[in-house]
Structure formats: structure tokens, C-alpha cells
């Protein structure tokens, strides 16, 4: 990052802190609350359930419980009720309603491996403020998700290394004061079955000791031939109010997931005619096991009326192993798909500890909410991927149009990767939220991070490493034109070490980015509908992209993304709730090479995308509490392979939903998805790794309050 950019940010921060000329005589307040993880529904906090679709508070943008309308940055909150109404358990599906989020590599259907926000791809996402995607963890389960929050633009000054497009933070369900048990079971097209149980239990009469267990079991087939998955998910959590000033929260997750590794279909000559979206090009026994265990705790203590202390730690361990038959480029005959046979054996450990001091006070005639935080992370990963070639004189190919399965597995020469990666990082971050007047608010933040990475390559007996220091910053202003309408602007920087090795076995230079944003926030219809419209411009250096010639990543130089997005959520009337988004994103490589030329579109990012979900809930009569609704999703054409002309066509889908509330304790649901049976492709990595979208399908569900 250039010194001029850093200097401009520093100047803005100093100016905001030092300028008291904005002060007015009338009183002004900083609308912030301490986090109450055991709040009831009627008192929303940054971690509580959301009434309807409209969240009013978040901690993702500031790590403090802050009113969303007071945050000088775009943030989308997709509550669990959206997934419930859609009859979906997919984080990907929820992100359709965040605005400007694009689907990327899902690692053969195994993980939430990558996605894009505002044009830039990231493999980072967070759970309760902790990095949650180190290694290859299984896809997050909806059973214990309370909210999915997307902070738009760089957030490195708060979360550390990351991408400048944005940050996804999943807020998990916390123990509540009232006892309840909810059982939901569902069945759907292609023999998909799921049962989820949510048991919340106060363990003492005073409500100081609480427990909650979320459990889910899945057994799914697919519209894709021979593709199936099984999952068991258990997430116990405990909350203990030790005394009026001290609170302890312990959360755990255990996942056992097995699924068929599925890279999708092949597009012959970059076209689709004659290729069935159900055709599976692997082998029916290509199964990958993914086991994950996680435990984390957070201890909050109120030191006095001004200062509070938070100590939190997170440990995650995972293993992924199995075999896969993966497509390679199509042969000259236009129907023979070459394949490679791969064995994977990976494991990882990640431990993170955070210590934060928070204070709320007046200084220089202004109100401040200060956060001083430190973070230490120790991440270790063993990764072995073995390519097993066919013996001489044989092939391991399959016919694209008439696949025949059950070929003997290759047993020839072995090659691939085998390495140990160790990453340690230490960070100090500072943040100040400031009330200048009753209308003008500001935010400044900075983070210093030291990063050490070492990779022991067992195939070459070579050790490589990198050591990086990074200073990232963020500053923003929000001006309230009226009680319902505010203008905001911000600028922030990002830093992310590029993990892994290039084709020559060397580590990459780190990515650096800067983002600018300006927008308007509105609270409409008597504060029933929240809207945010913002324009952005983001630049990034040392962007990694897949080089098809070597099947490895490379740093292509520079990229730029700019555009605008609109998001809205609310309870428009007592009966109608809506959530929707629209985004225009112009994302391209601005400094490339022969393989990925300057001007190339960034992989998987549509210029135009939009979504809308509306639900009508009956307020009277025998249908009181029942609802009907519809969802619409549009995604424009996208680059299907870096540096080529291969594109995925635009698509649009329509879903219908209905829930019948038979009694206070029994609800029956029906979801009809892609009712017009649109044939579409939701993501790709190349023209021989293309993931088709689901055809028309249905899900029926039964929910019992026990």
C-alpha cells in the first residue's frame, strides 16, 4: 500500500479525533449497548434472534453492540428466519439476499471454500468473530445459525488479514432464559431427509446457568447421478452469569460429514447443448470424509462503569480424507472426458485467543466508545494430495454423454503435494467510535499485525517461509440528515498473506487493498423498512487466480472493482415482511499477463444481480400465523474461467413457499423451488468444472414445539 494512501487515512483519523468544532450545545449520545447473550426476543441485541427480517443491531462492524443505522459502513444481516422461510439449510442461499455476494469454488461440494463480495474472492469467513475457515472445514450447518452478517468493504483493521470486498460473520444461537424444545423434520426431492432438534434449558431457577443443544442429522441424495451426502451435527452451548459483572459463554461444535466429491459437468467448446445437468463424471464411490471439532469460550467482565474486559479463545481441529475422480480437459473427439484420480489426506489445528478492553467515556467534549484488542493465532495444517496415474497403456476417461462407471482405479505413478504449513500471527488493534454532535458520528480504527508462515514441502525436502508486518486502517463518518435518513462515507485498507505455493514452489507476496465507500441509509414506513444504498471503489494488488496451464494459483498483479449496491429489509406491515438486494459490480484485472490479460473479468462475478423475498403472514381467522411467499433471484452472466472467453449465462429463479400453522405447536411447510425449471449453472472454476443449479424441486417440513 502506498505511503500516500496511508498518510491520507492517518490524516483523516487525526482530523476526526481532534476537531471539536462540530460540537453543539444540545446533548448527544452514542447508541451502544453491552452484549446480552441471554436476551429475550423483544429486546434485540447484536446476538439475539431477529423479529421478522429487519435486524437493528450488529457487532460484526465494530465488535460492539451498535445500532446498524449508526454504523458508517454497509452491513447486511440475513436472519435465520430467512432460511427457515425458504426451507433451506445453505449459507450460500442466505448470501443471495445480502447483495453483491457471488458463488465461487465450493471444493467439490464439500465446503464453503470461496465466495466473492463486491467482486473480490475470499476464503475467509467468521463465526462469532473468530476465523472459521482455516483448513477445509465442512459447510456451516444452519441448525445453530442465528444470523449471517456481511460487512461490505475492507475490515482488516478489526479482523486482521482478509480481503477488501467484505467479511462474512456467522452469529450462532445462544442459550436463552426461557425453556423450549423445537423439532423440525423435512423431506424433499431426490430422497433428501433432515431432522433438526433445538433444546434450550435453564439449569437453575434464577436463569444464571443456561444450556442449549442444537442437533441435525441429514441423509441426502441429489439430482446429480450417484451424488449423496450424510451429516451429523451437534452443537452444545452453555451460558453462566457468575455474578452481576461477569459472564461466561462456552460453545462447541462436532461435525461428521461424508459426501461424494463432485466437480460438476463439462462444457464442450464452451457450450451446453446435449450435456445433462444430472451427469456425474466421477465414480459412485468417490467419497470424502470431513470431521470437525470446535470449542470456544468468551469471558466478559465489567470492571467499572466505564471499562469492561473480554477474554475469548477458540480451538478448531479437522480431518479430511478420501478419494475423487476429477474431470480434466475434454479430448479432441468432443465427448471423452479425461480424468485424474486423487487421494486426499489433510488435517489441521487452529487456535485463536483474543483479549479486548472496551470503554465508554467523554473526552475533549465528545463521547467515545473505545476498543483496544489483541489477538494471537497458531494455525497448523498437514496437506497431502496424491495424483495416481493409470498404468502404461491404459486411460481413466469417461464418456460425457453415456458415462460407464466402475473402471479399475489407476495404480500407476504417484505425484502431487505433501507439505506442512505453520502460521503464527500476533495483532494489536484500536478503534474509537465517536459522537461529535447529535447528528454527526465517526469511527476510526487501526491494526498492527505480525505474520509468520513456514511451509515444509516433503516432496522437494525444501522449506520456505515469509514474515510480514502490516498496518491497516479504517475511518468513517455518518451524518444524520433527519431521524430517518443518514449519509455515510468510509475508507479502509486490507492485507492478506497469500497462503500456499506457486508452480515453482515459492510463497506469494501478500495481497494489499484499499476501499472507498459512500452511501445513504434510510428507515422508512415508521422505521419498519431499513435500506442502504452505497457506491464503492476497491483496488487490490497481488490477486491470486487459477492458472489453467499449471492448475495452480498465481499472483496476476492488480484488480479493481467498482459499482453500487442496494439492500433492504423490513416488516412493511404487520403481515408483510421483505428482504432484498441489488448489485452492480464492474470487476476486472487492471494489470495482468499473457495468461490472464489486463481487462479480464474477475472469475464468477456478475455485473448485475438481485434478489427479493416477500412473505405474507395471515393475522386473523383460522389461518392466523400461517404464511405464503415467493422468492426471486437473478444473476447475470459471469466469467467461467480466469483469462478466457468462457462465460456462464445469466439465470433467474422463482421459489414459492407456504406454512400452515395447525396449532401453536404444529406447523407444516411446503417449499417449491425453481418452479419454472430454469436450467442454469451457479459456479465454475473452468469449462471442465461447472456446477449446475438444482432443477425444479420441493421440500415438505413439519415443525413441532414440544
For the regions a protein language model found, what residue spans apply to each?
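Face-selective signature of the C-terminal outer-membrane beta-barrel domain
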Residues: 298-318, 340-456
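C-terminal beta-signal and adjacent terminal beta-strands/loops
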Residues: 573, 633-641, 656-706
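Structural signature of Gram-negative outer-membrane beta-barrels, strongest in the C-terminal barrel
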Residues: 239-243, 253, 348, 367-379, ...
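Acidic/polar loop-and-plug regions of large Gram-negative outer-membrane beta-barrel proteins
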Residues: 218-222, 234-302, 315-348, 392-421, ...
